Amino acid sequence: MSQRKARGPPAMPGVGHSQTQAKARLLPGADRKRSRLSRTRQDPWEERSWSNQRWSRATPGPRGTRAGGLALGRSEASPENAARERSRVRTLRQAFLALQAALPAVPPDTKLSKLDVLVLAASYIAHLTRTLGHELPGPAWPPFLRGLRYLHPLKKWPMRSRLYAGGLGYSDLDSTTASTPSQRTRDAEVGSQVPGEADALLSTTPLSPALGDK
């Protein structure tokens, strides 16, 4: 009896082996949990280091600083460019106003666009060229100016569509301001035959209806 008590209860077969297997099974799970915890603890540091690397890549190098310096230089020079552009526009506007003032019978308060001024100036130059007896050169003049007649601003304004289309053909409005080539030749023949009568007519006829009434 004493030997049996000292020895203790007999061990059941297979019980110790099952306990060791259970411990062996539990150990990998514990290792997995520990590895997960370690990963979660290390992840923020890894993310920070990765973000630091990404930030270091995104930071501009010497080229970026050079580009930034160029941008600053351009922004500093932009007021000078704006002032230069304003002076250019002012000079161009003054030139067009001077050209408009040189056109005959254009009131000073008449508002004409730049295209209007150019069309009227071209038509007036064509009229003067024909008056002097010179033919308009074909290749030197644009096609729409070859048949252009003198456009009177007071007759054409404010009909802008007729301002550009009236010079291409002979319209009723042009008949009062310009004469056909046959009429010009007839007038020249009459003037050469009776120069005294023509001078008398020019001296007696008033310049305008308003002056004639006076």
Swiss-Prot record:
GO terms for biological process: cell differentiation; decidualization; developmental process; muscle organ development; negative regulation of muscle cell differentiation; negative regulation of transcription by RNA polymerase II; positive regulation of gene expression; regulation of transcription by RNA polymerase II. Residues 174-183 have a biased composition (Polar residues). It is found in: Nucleus. It holds the Pfam family HLH. Signal peptide: none annotated. InterPro entries: bHLH_dom, E-box_TF_Regulators, HLH_DNA-bd_sf. The keyword Phosphoprotein does not apply. Residues 76-128 form the bHLH domain. Forms inactive heterodimeric complexes with TCF3. This is Transcription factor 23.
